[in-house]
From Swiss-Prot:
Residues 143-145 are annotated as: Interaction with tRNA. This is tRNA-specific 2-thiouridylase MnmA. GO terms for biological process: tRNA wobble position uridine thiolation. HAMAP family: tRNA_thiouridyl_MnmA. Keywords: ATP-binding, Cytoplasm, Disulfide bond, Nucleotide-binding, RNA-binding, Transferase, tRNA processing, tRNA-binding. SUPFAM superfamilies: Adenine nucleotide alpha hydrolases-like. Coiled coil: none annotated. Catalyzes the 2-thiolation of uridine at the wobble position (U34) of tRNA, leading to the formation of s(2)U34. The lineage of its organism: Bacteria, Bacillati, Actinomycetota, Actinomycetes, Mycobacteriales. The keyword Kinase does not apply. Disulfide bonds join 101-193.
Length: 357
């Protein structure tokens, strides 16, 4: 089988490539150049797009004895990930750029190019498993990345390979060291790669500009003015620009955002609790949409917990009733449905949250 391996320059994708070689496949490594402007992408850790990371990936490919290329996806990445991220925040949403990157870059644009060039599959260093075409959590639940892959269609998954999903992260590092890969001790990073400063508010402000509005409490009283709703997210407690806690002495949190009026609503932590979610553009990883309510577990953050729920498809949208309330759920987040079985937690599907009540 001809396999294209997406090599970020980190330890995970490096071991994934090595395992594909060991399995006897015809392997080619590729690194995606996601920016042409120096200093615009985070480097030195678990990067996926810097010159330093490309160099690390090339050195691993040399050790493995496989061809290696760098493909320029900068324009596509800007349009489908960065611009989407900015526009989503301007609408008062809270997107996950890693979800969007997997959906539109790695397993759409990159996978399509791979198939067009005659490759049979795209392998990555994601912590997830595929068994009988079913997407499942990784063995290492602490590193599991099935959440950010839950937007993939059955057709996209049919051409995907996740070689390290059955191995805990410490063992991956040990394996890399045994293989003599210099990235064995390379640090992980959980930051947004295209915000090198780590200051999301400043990044968004520079691109959206000042759009003044008000911060109001449950009575409608104006507590403060702000420079744009992009500086806030549901559940936020710090950096609200308000004088202090509420009249009862309890902290106040962002409970709602109205991008059209520029109004940021704040209230008590109990106001953050929701018991139902509405998801747009649902994707079912099996390729088959359920025709009846489904008992499942729901996760709304990449490294968040799950709660039991019932999900039902109605008029093209996913309606989810939670058995236990969740706090701080924001429009723009991805909701992922899981189902437990003897082979591990299976991903049923996902949707983008449009409302939480």
């Amino acid at each position: 089988m001809r396999v294209l391996v997406a090599m970020s320059g980190g330890v995970d994708s490096s071991v994934a490539a090595a395992r594909m070689v060991d399995a006897g496949h015809d392997v080619v490594g590729v690194h995606l150049a996601l920016s042409s402007a120096p200093g615009t992408l985070r480097t030195g850790s678990r990067g996926c797009c810097s010159k330093e990371d490309a160099g690390d990936a090339r050195r691993v490919a040399d050790v493995l004895g496989i061809p290696f290329y760098v493909w320029d996806f900068a324009d596509r990445f800007k349009e489908d990930v960065i611009d989407d991220f900015v526009e989503s925040y301007a609408r008062g949403e809270t997107p996950n750029p890693c979800v969007r990157c997997n959906e539109r870059i790695k397993f759409s644009a990159l996978s399509a190019r791979a198939l067009a060039l005659g490759f049979d599959a795209l392998a990555t260093g994601h912590y997830a498993r595929l068994t009988d075409g079913r997407l499942r959590r990784a063995v290492d639940h602490d590193k599991d990345q099935s959440y950010v892959l839950a937007v993939l269609t059955a057709e996209q998954l049919r051409h995907a390979v996740f070689p390290i999903g059955d191995t805990p992260k410490p063992a991956i590092r040990e394996e890399a060291a045994r293989r003599g890969l210099a990235v064995a001790d390379k640090a992980d990073s959980h930051d947004i790669c295209f915000i090198p400063s780590g200051d999301t508010r400043a990044f968004l402000g520079a691109r959206i500009g000042v759009r003044r509005g008000s911060v109001v409490d449950a009575t409608g009283a104006v507590l403060a003015e702000h420079d744009g709703v992009h500086g806030f997210t549901i559940g936020q407690r710090k950096g609200l620009g308000i004088p202090g806690p509420g009249p009862d002495g309890r902290p106040r949190y962002v409970t709602g955002i109205d991008a059209e009026t520029g109004t940021v609503h704040v209230g008590d932590v109990t106001d953050l609790e929701v018991t139902s979610l509405l998801g747009e553009a649902p994707v079912f990883t099996s390729g088959v949409a359920p025709d009846a309510p489904v008992e499942c577990a729901v996760q709304v953050r990449a490294h968040g917990g799950v709660v039991d729920a019932v999900a039902e498809l109605r008029d093209g949208a996913l309606e989810v009733s939670l058995r236990t309330p969740l706090r701080g759920v924001a429009p723009g987040q991805t909701l992922v449905l899981y189902r437990s079985d003897p082979d591990g937690d299976e991903v049923l599907g996902s949707a983008t949250i449009s409302a939480a009540r």
